[in-house]
Swiss-Prot record:
Its main location: cytoplasm. It is an enzyme of class 3 (hydrolase). This is Peptidyl-tRNA hydrolase. GO terms for molecular function: peptidyl-tRNA hydrolase activity; tRNA binding. Keywords: Cytoplasm, Hydrolase, RNA-binding, tRNA-binding. It comes from the Bacteria. The gene is pth. It is found in: Cytoplasm. Belongs to the PTH family. The record marks N11 as: Discriminates between blocked and unblocked aminoacyl-tRNA. One of its GO terms (biological process) is protein quality control for misfolded or incompletely synthesized proteins. It catalyses: an N-acyl-L-alpha-aminoacyl-tRNA + H2O = an N-acyl-L-amino acid + a tRNA + H(+). NCBIfam families: pth.
Amino acid sequence: MTIKLIVGLANPGAEYAATRHNAGAWYVDFLAERLRAPLREEPKFFGYTSRINLEGEDVRLLVPTTFMNLSGKAVAAMASFYRINPDEILVAHDELDLPPGVAKFKLGGGHGGHNGLKDIISKLGNNPNFHRLRIGIGHPGDKNKVVGFVLGKPPVTEQKLIDEAIDEAARCTEVWFKEGLAKATSRLHTFKAQ
């Protein structure tokens, strides 16, 4: 099993670019930059895309330009066009249940209230069995404050921790392709930015 599509979830537009909800896109942007594969807008996939080579594997990158709750439209369009199965997809997203500075890989599961994941599961035929990269953004402590929190910008100290976790997640993604998911998971899950 190998990953053929890496997706970074986000809301489109400059006003959302620096908000916590866009952490998934920050990861894909970082990966694209690290591998010198600039993202370009591709309307038929409703997003920005690129193509990278990891250990001889052809991998597509995607940052949807739809709003978060319509992310599945972009993911399904690309998966269908390139005949990519759900278990060959890695979706990077912001995660309230992990603190800033932590990121974890996960296969399958629910959507945990995340509207981007919810729409992807739905558009993939109610199939939740894709890989996720959960990027910790922390929790406001009160569920009524979640919307304002994810659509807010993290303070500089938290942004630094999130950026370090994204850097490590990108390195661990490369480890995944070189040495397998178990090795990559073990390394990423013991990492915590200070």
